[in-house]
């Protein structure tokens, strides 16, 4: 791809002084033509210009940010590698741009216009792009030598742009320069882009160079015209990669003074540069080796992702067994690196050099478990010196240095050392010494990052994996992670999220105390109709369909399913047709019957297993007016879908959940028993459950059958000392077949509904997690935060000790302070601005069991519309000079000081108005 044409109300952290009101953040832009786009990096910008053929439109981030994305289209030129080239009438080729090895096309020929719209623009519209960036508008000048030819070409450009605006009236359009036609098309476009104002590229080799004042003066003539039309003007300047960290921000400020939106990047435009706003780098690259085990089963994922996620960061797993180390340009999206390899890295000298190069870009590196090399002398360049241990069985060591960071769940074990380790210019976290005063530092913070090796990070005891180091503190200190507002998936409007989902297994199991009943009957009568909270129920097609395993029982089972799905509080879902046991065994679209259920005559089809089942549920088991419809697959078997299957569900807009082993208990109160929120494969996320199902708590359904009661321990331990998970009551339909298991369900539900919760459907939880992985956060020089991409995820979490009252902004409904964590509630908009300014008290929402569907806030007022799945409850802070009104009126209103508690007995929707006097 070539270059562009070259011619607190609550806020954060230790704020010691009140700041003046911070205005709307400056507009920013990014131009990224690479592949594997990072939405946490680009999402914050107002203009996101991309090479559309490098964008996977099925990934969640595209759906979140598509309104701000602009698809690149070259006008009057075409690259031979462009997919549209095959469909080009070659008679349109009238020349060659040798600098770019592209073909010049006759834009005055009506056939070109037809080709442009049919083969280059419309396919991208169909893929989901809404906005476009027209490049190479001046290519015609290479072939139009006479004034008449130029006039004709410019008229053709104007016609193309007018046609685009007429054909796609809601689309936005950016032009690269186009100065010659600006007077005729300015009303059809949103912005003008140009390049090389102070720093550009030139010559055959496109070398970086300074731009002359004469060239800037020439540009200013045309740019002033664009300003007069009130168009945004995007200026791209170019710097070598190694100069970006030191020079880019200076250049940004310089360009801003001219009234332009700056973007500073390398000439390739395939890494992330700098603009007026820049995203905090939330992604942490984690090097892994999947040559033996899939990432699902690696310690790096199972225990390493959660501490990052809790602090607002994202683990990005990178398999070095299949790919070389990323280039330094590719590393610009990352906030740090964790090396967590189970084998030594083969090209260890390259690994060390790579780490050293990253330091110029302030990307820190943390070694976990080992240094992953065989030649320890390579470590000397990192300030680490090793010597051999003569007595490899010696364990008589004393501790001479131990940070508070060490000894988190267990003290470091006394095990034999493999080498003595000394450090230079670092802070030792854990150092031991033998009787000969030979010392070894096993964990340290270093100028380039840090390390925790030889069981100073984690240790296995009785098959439990325990943290020796505090992972929250270790990751933060070693990688120099900033404290940031954390997009939080556990809480909504100040209350812990509660959802419940049921895997469809065993609907046909006979009830042990009444063989006339099926387990589906008792789940319906004793659970679904008795607890009004949202519950998502899946079915296995082969268990209930006429062409399934039980054709004689099918009519009765289908009747049960229809009764379940007729309930207002029940959401339908699929647990597939044949319950695949091992998803990675699907080869060439087929799955051997030994890896699934075996209905007679069935030929395996992935499409039928998932989308086909959802369609059948919606068409055959739901009333026409039933909402929500079935749109979620609950993974079966090993719950480990490979990337091609994840891509399938995203392509078909199907939600997914299951997997992850969260079953921390009083007997096993270790962080390793709490799973992360999900697992990424090639940009697609498998969403994990909140907690595990009853199969785990009953020893794989061998007993005790009351064992699911212990999930309450899990709920408690994932709430304090840190709220790590929502409450997810997750089980199988076969739990309705035994008294002990059914009573356990009642015990769990009864406990859950007594908590301070916000009940939602499973299909409402899943998109919150999907949002987490694409939210983009920026911090300005004035301690102002801008958070974008909060589409379904509506909570930001802060450390309570770091909070200060600040002005409540447009999209902020309120907040709730708990002992250690405080939660900020957002309105229906996807963007929020947090300004550090203390102000007098305003009315705000403290908590609610509902969802905010509309928020309107003035300087002296707030209006909220809320909708809940159960009778609405809310708590408000209402200053005494303010008046509260409700529609409809509530029967129970309790006031204590400035706190008003409102409880409805039936209504699930209400409008709240608070108006305050001057």
Feature names for model-found ranges:
Residues 96-108, 285, 361, 368-380, ...:
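Metal-dependent polysaccharide deacetylase catalytic core of the NodB/CE4 family, i.e.
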Residues 367, 751, 756-918:
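Non-catalytic C-terminal accessory domains or segments of carbohydrate-active enzymes
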Residues 345-418, 422:
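A glycine-rich, often tryptophan-bearing local segment used as a flexible ligand/cofactor-contacting loop or short
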Residues 33-46, 52-53, 294-374, 503:
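Helical hinge/lid and interdomain linker segments adjacent to catalytic or ligand-binding clefts
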Residues 227-240, 483-512, 528, 607, ...:
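Catalytic grooves of carbohydrate-active enzymes
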């Amino acid at each position: 791809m070539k270059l562009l044409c070259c011619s607190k109300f609550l806020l954060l952290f230790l704020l010691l002084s009140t700041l003046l009101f911070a205005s709307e953040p400056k507009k920013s832009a990014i131009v990224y033509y690479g592949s594997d786009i990072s939405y946490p990096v680009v999402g914050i910008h107002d203009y996101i210009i991309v090479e559309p053929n490098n964008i996977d439109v099925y990934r969640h981030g595209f759906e979140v940010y598509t309104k701000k994305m602009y698809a690149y289209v070259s006008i009057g030129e075409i690259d031979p590698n462009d997919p549209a080239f095959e469909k080009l009438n070659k008679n349109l080729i009238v020349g060659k741009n040798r600098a770019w090895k592209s073909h010049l096309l006759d834009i005055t020929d009506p056939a070109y216009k037809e080709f442009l719209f049919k083969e280059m623009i419309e396919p991208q519209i169909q893929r989901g792009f809404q906005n476009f960036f027209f490049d190479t508008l001046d290519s015609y000048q290479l072939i139009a030598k006479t004034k008449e030819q130029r006039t004709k070409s410019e008229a053709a450009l104007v016609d193309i742009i007018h046609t685009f605006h007429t054909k796609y009236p809601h689309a936005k359009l950016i032009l690269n320069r186009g100065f010659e036609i600006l007077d005729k098309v300015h009303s059809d476009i949103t912005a003008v882009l140009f390049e090389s104002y102070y720093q550009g590229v030139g010559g055959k080799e496109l070398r970086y160079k300074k731009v002359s004042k004469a060239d800037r003066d020439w540009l200013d003539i045309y740019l002033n015209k664009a300003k007069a039309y009130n168009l945004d003007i995007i200026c791209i300047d170019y710097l070598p990669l190694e100069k970006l960290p030191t020079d880019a921000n200076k250049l940004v400020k310089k360009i801003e003074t001219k009234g332009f939106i700056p973007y500073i990047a390398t000439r390739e435009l395939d890494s992330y540069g700098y603009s007026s706003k820049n995203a905090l780098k939330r992604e942490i690259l984690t090097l892994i080796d999947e040559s033996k085990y899939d990432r699902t089963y690696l310690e790096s994922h199972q225990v390493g992702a959660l501490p990052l996620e809790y602090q607002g960061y994202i683990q990005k797993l990178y398999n070095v067994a299949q790919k070389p180390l990323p280039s330094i340009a590719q590393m610009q999206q990352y906030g740090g690196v964790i090396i967590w390899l189970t084998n030594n890295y083969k090209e260890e000298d390259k690994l060390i050099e790579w780490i050293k190069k990253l330091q110029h870009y302030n990307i820190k590196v943390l070694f976990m478990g080992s240094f992953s090399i065989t030649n320890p002398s390579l470590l000397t360049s990192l300030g680490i010196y090793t010597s051999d241990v003569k007595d490899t069985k010696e364990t008589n060591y004393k501790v001479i240095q131990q940070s508070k960071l060490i000894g988190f769940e267990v003290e470091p074990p006394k095990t034999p050392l493999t080498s003595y380790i000394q450090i230079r210019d670092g802070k030792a976290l854990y150092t031991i010494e033998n009787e000969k005063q030979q010392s070894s530092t096993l964990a340290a913070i270093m100028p380039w990052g840090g390390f925790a090796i030889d069981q100073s990070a984690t240790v296995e005891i009785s098959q439990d994996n325990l943290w020796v180091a505090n992972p929250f503190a270790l990751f933060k200190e070693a990688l120099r992670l900033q404290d940031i507002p954390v997009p939080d998936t556990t809480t909504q409007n100040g209350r812990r999220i509660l959802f419940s989902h049921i895997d469809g297994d065993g609907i046909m199991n006979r009830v042990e105390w009444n063989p006339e009943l099926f387990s589906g009957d008792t789940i319906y009568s004793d659970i679904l109709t008795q607890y009004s909270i949202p519950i998502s129920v899946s079915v296995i097609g082969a268990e209930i369909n006429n062409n399934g395993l039980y054709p004689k029982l099918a009519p009765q089972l289908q009747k049960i399913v229809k009764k379940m799905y007729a309930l207002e509080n029940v959401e339908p879902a699929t647990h597939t047709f044949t319950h695949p046991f091992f998803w990675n065994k699907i080869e060439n679209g087929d799955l051997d019957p030994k890896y699934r259920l075996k209905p007679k005559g069935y030929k395996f089809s992935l499409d039928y297993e998932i989308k086909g089942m959802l369609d059948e549920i919606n068409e055959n088991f739901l009333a026409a007016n039933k909402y929500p419809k079935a749109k979620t697959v609950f993974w079966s078997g090993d719950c480990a879908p490979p990337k091609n299957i994840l891509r399938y569900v995203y392509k078909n807009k199907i939600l997914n959940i299951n997997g992850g082993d969260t079953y921390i208990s009083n007997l096993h109160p270790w962080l390793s028993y709490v799973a992360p929120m999900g697992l990424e494969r090639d940009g697609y996320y498998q969403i994990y459950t909140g907690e595990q199902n009853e199969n785990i708590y009953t020893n794989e359904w061998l007993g005790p059958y009351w064992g699911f009661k212990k999930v309450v321990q899990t709920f408690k331990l994932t709430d304090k000392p840190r709220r790590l998970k929502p409450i997810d009551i997750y089980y199988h339909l076969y739990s309705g077949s035994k008294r002990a298991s059914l009573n356990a369900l009642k015990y769990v539900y009864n406990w859950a509904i007594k908590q301070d919760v916000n009940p939602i459907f499973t299909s409402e939880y899943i998109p919150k997690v999907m949002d987490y992985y694409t939210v983009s956060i920026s911090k300005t020089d004035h301690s102002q935060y801008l958070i974008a991409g909060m589409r379904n995820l509506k909570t930001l979490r802060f450390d309570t000790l770091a909070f200060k009252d600040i002005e409540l902004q447009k999209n902020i409904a309120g907040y709730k302070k708990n002992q250690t964590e405080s939660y900020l509630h957002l309105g229906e908009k996807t963007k929020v601005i947090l300004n550090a300014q203390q102000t007098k008290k305003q009315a705000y929402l403290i908590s609610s069991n509902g969802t905010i569907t509309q928020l309107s806030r003035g300087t002296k007022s707030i209006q909220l519309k809320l909708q809940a799945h159960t009778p609405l409850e809310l708590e408000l802070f209402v200053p005494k000079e303010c008046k509260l009104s409700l529609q409809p009126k509530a029967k129970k209103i309790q006031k204590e000081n400035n706190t008003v508690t409102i409880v409805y007995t039936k209504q699930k929707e209400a409008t709240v108005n608070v108006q305050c006097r001057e």
